[in-house]
Amino acid sequence: MVYVLALLIGVIAGLRTMTAIAAVSWAAYLGYLSLDGSWLAFLGYRFTPWILSALALAEFVTDQLPFTPSRKVPVQFGARILSGAISGVAIALPGGTWVGGLIAGAAGAVIGTLGGAAARSRLATALGRDLPAALVEDAIAVVGAVLVVGLL
């Protein structure tokens, strides 16, 4: 089950880079995910979830801007994979299976990045505009992250 959750949080990172890691940070801060004593303990620190949430909100805004680069360019793609990998490790770490979590989270980020781009493109074409498609993607990312964290 832990690998499925790591994969799913990776998919969320593929949709929205900061949403996945912000959700994991909230889980650690609220005590749903024990990262104490690990190199990821900082995710549960007092201000970390607030900072990551602010960054996630900023990402929601900048994603709507016309000059924002594609999620498939190397820097954007790499950031999503890194976020998915770290989030996957955080989910798997309490069980001692961090390598599997890293792989599952990174793989999920690739799936989320490519699948999310394709789905959003089709939805934007169907709706005639990108903004509604982007907002649907935002909602899926947030609800998905909450559901994954809720299953921890």
Protein language model annotation of sequence segments:
Residues 70-82, 104, 129-136:
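Cytoplasmic-side transmembrane-helix entry/capping segments in multi-pass membrane proteins
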Residues 8-28:
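The first (N-terminal) embedded transmembrane alpha-helix
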Residues 25-26, 30-34, 43-62, 76-80, ...:
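Alpha-helical transmembrane segments and their juxtamembrane interface "caps"
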Residues 82-93, 102-118:
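Mid-bilayer segments of alpha-helical transmembrane spans in multi-pass integral membrane proteins
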Residues 135-152:
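Final/C-terminal transmembrane alpha-helix of multipass membrane proteins
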Residues 57-72, 114-126:
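C-terminal ends of transmembrane helices
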Residues 59, 79-88, 137-142:
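Core segments of transmembrane alpha-helices
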Residues 1-5, 27-47, 87-103, 147-152:
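Helix-coil boundary and interhelical linker segments in multi-pass alpha-helical membrane proteins
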